Curated annotation (Swiss-Prot):
Reaction catalysed by this enzyme: Exonucleolytic cleavage in either 5'- to 3'- or 3'- to 5'-direction to yield nucleoside 5'-phosphates
Subcellular location: Cytoplasm
Alphabetical keyword list: Cytoplasm, Exonuclease, Hydrolase, Nuclease
GO cellular component: cytosol; exodeoxyribonuclease VII complex
Entry's Gene Ontology BP terms: DNA catabolic process
Protein name, entry field: Exodeoxyribonuclease 7 small subunit
Main location: cytoplasm
Entry's EC annotation: 3.1.11.6
PANTHER family (alphabetical): EXODEOXYRIBONUCLEASE 7 SMALL SUBUNIT
Family in the record: Belongs to the XseB family.
GO molecular function, one term: exodeoxyribonuclease VII activity
Superkingdom as given in the UniProt entry: Bacteria
Major enzyme class: hydrolase
Length: 78
């Protein structure tokens, strides 16, 4: 019976490390053109996922800041 490798949750830091690895492979000069294009495509897709993640987190932070501002307005003045 074969076991599936347990998928770990997606992490921004791991994705950036993956992109850095792909860039190093591309810059090594050891890949043929088809492999370079494949690695480039993988890096571009991973960076798009990272950008989407960062945008989502930015929006979450804005909501939190807005909520904090509203809570501050609701505090009684002393």
């Amino acid at each position: 019976m074969s076991r599936r490798k347990r998928e770990e949750p997606w992490r921004y830091e791991a994705a950036i490390a993956e992109v850095e690895t792909l860039i190093a492979q591309i810059e090594s000069g050891e890949l043929d053109l088809a492999e370079v294009v494949e690695r480039f495509q993988q890096a571009a897709q991973t960076l798009k996922t990272c950008a989407d993640f960062l945008e989502q987190k930015r929006q979450q932070v804005e909501i939190i800041i807005e909520q904090l501002g509203q809570e501050e307005e609701d505090l009684p003045e002393s």
